[in-house]
Regions:
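Conserved GNAT acetyl-CoA-binding A-motif
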Residues: 108-120
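Conserved acetyl-CoA-binding loop-helix of GNAT-fold acetyltransferases
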Residues: 93-106, 129-133
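Conserved catalytic-core motifs of GNAT/GCN5-like acyltransferases
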Residues: 67-70, 117-120, 132, 137-154, ...
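Helix-loop element at the rim of GNAT/NAT acetyltransferase active sites that forms part
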Residues: 17-34
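Glycine-rich acetyl-CoA-binding "A-motif" of GNAT/NAT acetyltransferases
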Residues: 61-64, 126, 152
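Acetyl-CoA-dependent GNAT
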Residues: 32-90, 101-102, 107, 161-162, ...
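Conserved beta-strand-loop-alpha-helix junction that forms the acyl-donor binding cleft
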Residues: 92, 118-128
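A short beta-loop-alpha structural element at the N-terminal edge
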Residues: 2-15
Length: 199
């Protein structure tokens, strides 16, 4: 299994296919209409510019993906990022979710983000277990905040201080000043050298 940066043209269709059941079959996503491959490609392109979007791949098959996105629009929130990970149910329990997060967090740190937040529609023991295994701590619950499939759902929030922020002094620099060149740094994974590989 390799972790690499997502390519909007190459990966959008597979990513949209993985995501669609999470939209249509339950409360994991609060979207009510699954995005098309073209819409997903646009999301990948936008978030690659400001955050990071990674995929886990085995051969030519996408197992899952993870990304960071803005937490809130107002300026004081700019050092926080929401993170999400989705793994094809056929490939659960292979470690893809954790591997994706372990590769994602350093990329977000490089871009200046100091805090990762994850919102989880409850109950979801598997997602809670993954996030807590990755070091996230629960910080609160929004009660009955989402209505989907005929019922109200709670959303729990977990947060993780990104390691670089714990040892560095506070900076007033905008996260937008981080170099976009970092996302293309060559790293090896699974014995394969590629400018898009992470590991």
């Amino acid at each position: 299994m390799d972790i690499r940066h997502a390519n909007s043209a190459r990966d959008a269709e597979a990513i949209a296919a993985i995501y669609a059941p999470f939209v249509t079959n339950g409360p994991v996503s609060f979207e009510d209409v699954a995005p098309t491959a073209a819409e997903m490609a646009g999301r990948i392109e936008r978030l690659t510019e400001t955050h990071a979007w990674l995929v886990a791949e085995d051969g030519d098959e996408i197992l899952g993906y993870a990304y960071g996105c803005p937490h809130r629009e107002r300026a004081a929130y700019q050092w926080a990022t929401e993170v999400s990970v989705y793994v094809d149910p056929r490939h659960h329990r292979r470690g893809a979710g954790r591997a994706l997060y372990e590769a994602l967090f350093p990329r977000l740190e490089e871009r200046g983000y100091r805090l990762a937040l994850a919102g989880i529609a409850l109950p979801n023991d598997a997602s809670v277990g993954l996030h807590e295994a990755c070091g996230f701590e629960p910080v609160g619950v929004y009660r009955r905040i989402g209505f989907k499939h005929g019922k109200w759902w709670d959303v729990g929030w977990w947060q993780l201080e990104l390691p670089a922020s714990q040892s560095s002094s506070s900076s007033n620099a905008s996260v937008g000043q981080a170099s976009t060149a970092r996302r293309a740094s060559p790293i090896r994974s699974g014995g394969t050298s590629d400018s898009s590989m992470i590991g």
